[in-house]
Amino acid sequence: MINHFSVLGIKPSAKEDDIKKAYRRLSNKYHPDKLLGASDEEKEQASQQLERVKKAYEVLSDPKLRNAFIRDFNNVIVTDPNSAMRELWDQFYP
């Protein structure tokens, strides 16, 4: 399960304004139009990361979705720690 808080680089206690600021900062960072001189591969990776950022913002900016995410995230049982670590690693180094 992707941790939307980690994607945006914020704490679970973040306020709505902090969520917006993180979203704006990251969407500017990963937007393809901002990546002048980047290779096609780098642009593709940035595009994938931008989609993660958009999804995280969509979930965390809506109070109902945010509460459901927190509830579900707290109920996740890690059955394969290696897989969980790979997923976490891939969030930061796609």
UniProtKB/Swiss-Prot annotation:
Chain ranges of the J domain: 3-93
Ordered alphabetically, the record's keywords are: Chaperone, Stress response
TM annotation in the entry: none
Phenotype upon gene inactivation: Deletion of the gene leads to a dramatically reduced growth at low temperature.
Which N-terminal residues, if any, form the signal peptide? none
Stretch list, region Essential for interaction with AtcC = 74-94
Induction cue: Part of the atcJABC operon. The operon is constitutively expressed, and expression shows only a very slight increase at low temperature.
Query: What PROSITE patterns does the record point to?
Result: DNAJ_2
The protein's matches in Pfam families, at most eight in alphabetical order, are given as: DnaJ
User: What CDD domains does the record point to?
Assistant: DnaJ
Q: Give the miscellaneous note.
A: Stimulation of the ATPase activity of DnaK is much higher with DnaJ than with AtcJ.
Know anything about its domains from the record?
Answer: The J-domain is required for stimulation of DnaK activity. The C-terminal extension of 21 amino acids is essential for AtcC binding and to support cold resistance.
Summarize subunit and interaction data from the UniProt record for this chain.
Interacts via its C-terminal extension with AtcC. Does not interact with AtcA and AtcB.
The role this protein plays is: Involved in cold adaptation. The J-domain is functional and can stimulate the ATPase activity of the DnaK chaperone. May work as a co-chaperone of the DnaK system to support cold resistance.
- In Swiss-Prot or TrEMBL terms, this protein is called Adaptation to cold protein J
Organism (species) = Shewanella oneidensis (strain ATCC 700550 / JCM 31522 / CIP 106686 / LMG 19005 / NCIMB 14063 / MR-1)
The gene for this chain is atcJ
